[in-house]
Curated annotation (Swiss-Prot):
Activity across pH: Optimum pH is 7.5-8.5.
Positions in the Extracellular compartment: 1-104, 173-195, 242-332, 391-411, 475-476, 536-547
Keyword Ion transport: yes
Function: Symporter that cotransports neutral amino acids and sodium ions from the extraccellular to the intracellular side of the cell membrane. The transport is electrogenic, pH dependent and partially tolerates substitution of Na(+) by Li(+). Preferentially transports smaller amino acids, such as glycine, L-alanine, L-serine, L-asparagine and L-threonine, followed by L-cysteine, L-histidine, L-proline and L-glutamine and L-methionine.
Signal peptide: none
GO CC terms, sorted: microvillus membrane
Name by which UniProt lists this protein: Sodium-coupled neutral amino acid transporter 4
Expression triggers: Up-regulated by insulin.
Record keywords: Amino-acid transport, Cell membrane, Cell projection, Disulfide bond, Glycoprotein, Ion transport, Membrane, Phosphoprotein, Sodium, Sodium transport, Symport, Transmembrane, Transmembrane helix, Transport
Length: 547
């Protein structure tokens, strides 16, 4: 018997697709369950495989205790909501302001609400399919629906999503660790030293911290890291809201061509500190002055609107500081993939469901409603206030945008440190299921081997580092993974599994028609987004010096 598989699930009619009937009421033959569990081929699997099968939410309990799906869940409603919220929240929140800048406020809100609602509907389909299909494992549902191709499709989608998450975390290390070091050393700008090079730093962190943690057989700190990561993101959103009211618009002395602060190597650099309500920090802009002229401006240009503090604002500043409500450009194509990437939690829904106390589909759907709604509010706040801080100059990784405004700021430094610690500790957690899936696929029924354990981890980390070093910006990770694997996990696979496995509803029923429309919508989203992103790569090639 496969673990977490519902061998004896009845398929009695269930008129309410979110029925409150507990899934465990459907079991028969419970007297043989302990014997079946002990005879399971998975009973002797290594601890890492046990953790993967439940995605880390079952702690240190033996797999045999969970081999049958009739076991009662022990996780409270509140903790299940917290676990799912943490599964949703990730690095995608850092790219939402960029998405808003390239869609406009109103269009972004419409898209955000749409993706959130579709994610909830996807969870509904997944929970219904899990009961009818008799399994709480995503890959197993794929195998039951479409055989080996379905299993491989689910495996590839989940693995790609995890690799994308790993890469985005390493990108954050690449972006933010140099800024933290620069702040601690009191440097006003990146001097180009090796210890300020993000490519070197991400390699050092990967080899010195991430790889050793990935070699552990169990990740006992998982629970602590989950809570810490979510707390970091709440702190991040709070600081983004607070800083919006400190950053002036337009930003002083911006170069008219590229929107960056102008530096002139032939002129001395002076620091302008604008008034700030914070007692511990100021908003610092690096300015060049020659005879009190702003950087890069000649005598004729100085005739422009120069303020008494020597800071010149752009002539078109008022227009640049007006929020846009509808925007369409080549980068708008990244919006839906970024949102899809931010809302993916579906591989974690089933393990959390399996551990929910007094579980039922209705109760798990309520958990999903609360978690996704809470993340929706956080995403909207982060995107809106991040966008209103920088408008069109916002970057694809929001934290990095503050680097051109602040040379040093205590609150931002704390956010950067917290986020860096969180993502560094999260990378090994994401790596574990990737490695276990690869081992299960390539070396089925083989005993645990430290050589495979180490070698596969090293290869995965090496490939992700190469990806992070070669790919110029995190938006390509958000865009490609969001358009491919995230769309598969949210739209295509749940709908396809539902159409194939739920037999009691006729093909022309409203439920099946809705699932079919959902499937077609997902395919259109994936193909359209991928096509637009590829066109953007062709006609707007990335700047190799980006970041």
């Amino acid at each position: 018997m496969d673990p977490m598989e519902l061998n004896n699930v009845s398929i009695e009619p269930d008129g309410d697709s979110c029925s409150g009937d507990s899934i465990q009421d459907s079991y028969t033959g419970m007297e043989n369950s302990d014997k079946d569990a002990m005879n399971s081929q998975f009973a002797n699997e290594d601890a890492e495989s046990q953790k993967f099968l439940t995605n880390g939410f079952l702690g240190k309990k033996k797999l045999a205790d969970y081999a049958d799906e009739h076991h009662p869940g022990m996780t409270s409603f509140g903790m299940s909501s917290f676990n799912l919220s943490n599964a949703i929240m990730g690095s995608g929140i850092l790219g939402l302001s960029y998405a808003m800048a390239n869609t406009g406020i109103i269009l972004f809100i419409i898209m955000l609400l749409t993706v959130a609602i579709l994610s909830l509907y996807s969870v509904h389909l997944l929970l219904k399919t899990a009961k009818e299909g008799g399994s709480l494992i995503y890959e197993k549902l794929g195998e039951k629906a479409f055989g080996w191709p379905g299993k491989i499709g689910a495996f590839i989608s989940i693995t790609m999503q995890n690799i994308g998450a790993m890469s985005s975390y390493l990108f954050i290390i690449k972006y933010e660790l140099p800024e933290v070091i620069r702040a601690f050393m009191g440097l006003e700008e990146n001097t180009g030293e090796w210890y300020l090079n993000g490519n070197y730093l991400v390699l050092f962190v990967s080899v010195g911290i991430i790889l050793p943690l990935s070699l552990l057989k169990n990740l006992g700190y998982l629970g602590y890291t989950s809570g810490f990561s979510l707390s970091c993101m709440v702190f991040f959103v709070s600081v983004v809201i607070y800083k919006k009211f400190q950053i002036p618009c337009p930003l002083p002395a911006l170069d008219h061509n590229n929107g960056n602060l102008t530096f002139n190597n032939t002129l001395p650099i002076h620091m302008i500190s604008l008034p700030n309500d914070s007692e511990s920090s100021g908003v610092n802009f690096m300015m060049d002055y020659a005879h009190h002229n702003p950087a890069g401006l000649d005598e004729k240009q100085v005739a422009g609107p120069l303020h008494s503090n020597g800071v010149e604002y752009e002539a078109q500043g008022a227009e640049k500081c007006q929020p846009k409500y509808f925007v369409f450009n080549s980068r708008t194509a990244y919006a839906i993939p970024i949102l899809a990437f931010a809302f993916v939690c579906h591989p974690e829904v089933l393990p959390i469901y399996s551990e929910l106390k007094d579980r039922s589909r209705r109760k798990m759907q309520t958990v999903s409603n609360i978690s996704i709604s809470g993340m929706l509010v956080m995403y909207l706040l982060a995107a809106l206030f991040g966008y209103l801080s920088f408008y069109g100059d916002v970057e694809d990784e929001l934290l990095h945008a503050y680097s051109k405004v602040y040379t040093f700021d205590t609150a931002l430094l704390m956010v950067r440190l917290a986020v860096l610690v969180a993502v560094t500790l999260t990378v090994p957690i994401v790596l574990f299921p990737i490695r276990t899936s690869v081992i299960t696929l390539l070396f089925p029924r083989k005993p645990f081997s430290w050589l495979k354990h180490f070698g596969i981890a090293a290869i995965i980390i090496a490939l992700n580092n190469i990806l992070v070093i070669l790919v110029p910006t995190i938006k390509y990770i958000f865009g490609f993974i969001g358009a491919s694997s995230a769309t598969m996990l949210i739209f295509i696979l749940p709908a396809a599994f539902y159409l194939k496995l739920v037999k009691k509803e006729p093909l022309r029923s409203p439920q099946k028609i809705g699932a079919l429309v959902f499937l077609v919508t997902g395919i259109i989203f994936m193909m359209g987004s991928m096509a637009l992103i590829i066109l953007d790569w062709i006609y707007n090639p990335p700047n190799p010096n980006h970041h």
